[in-house]
UniProtKB/Swiss-Prot annotation:
<protein>
    <recommendedName>
        <fullName>Large ribosomal subunit protein uL30</fullName>
    </recommendedName>
</protein>
<dbReference type="GO" id="GO:0006412">
    <property type="term" value="P:translation"/>
</dbReference>
<dbReference type="InterPro" id="IPR016082">
    <property type="entry name" value="Ribosomal_uL30_ferredoxin-like"/>
</dbReference>
<dbReference type="InterPro" id="IPR036919">
    <property type="entry name" value="Ribo_uL30_ferredoxin-like_sf"/>
</dbReference>
<dbReference type="InterPro" id="IPR005996">
    <property type="entry name" value="Ribosomal_uL30_bac-type"/>
</dbReference>
<dbReference type="Pfam" id="PF00327">
    <property type="entry name" value="Ribosomal_L30"/>
</dbReference>
<dbReference type="GO" id="GO:0003735">
    <property type="term" value="F:structural constituent of ribosome"/>
</dbReference>
<comment type="subunit">
    <text>Part of the 50S ribosomal subunit.</text>
</comment>
<dbReference type="GO" id="GO:0022625">
    <property type="term" value="C:cytosolic large ribosomal subunit"/>
</dbReference>
<dbReference type="InterPro" id="IPR018038">
    <property type="entry name" value="Ribosomal_uL30_CS"/>
</dbReference>
<comment type="similarity">
    <text>Belongs to the universal ribosomal protein uL30 family.</text>
</comment>
<keyword id="KW-0687">Ribonucleoprotein</keyword>
<keyword id="KW-0689">Ribosomal protein</keyword>
Amino acid sequence: MATKTVKVTQTKSGIGRLPKHRATLTGLGLRRIGHTVELEDTPSVRGMINKVYYMVKVED
């Protein structure tokens, strides 16, 4: 059985944001605007996405 994944793309810069939000972007593996990563769809990843929802775009 394949695990469900979610694509996350950074749409805004982390400059000038709260340090915890910048750390969350790094934790998601995002490095720059336009960078896309594919992650497992787990509650912890969803929580990180919800924390920085205003800087990312999510595709299921």
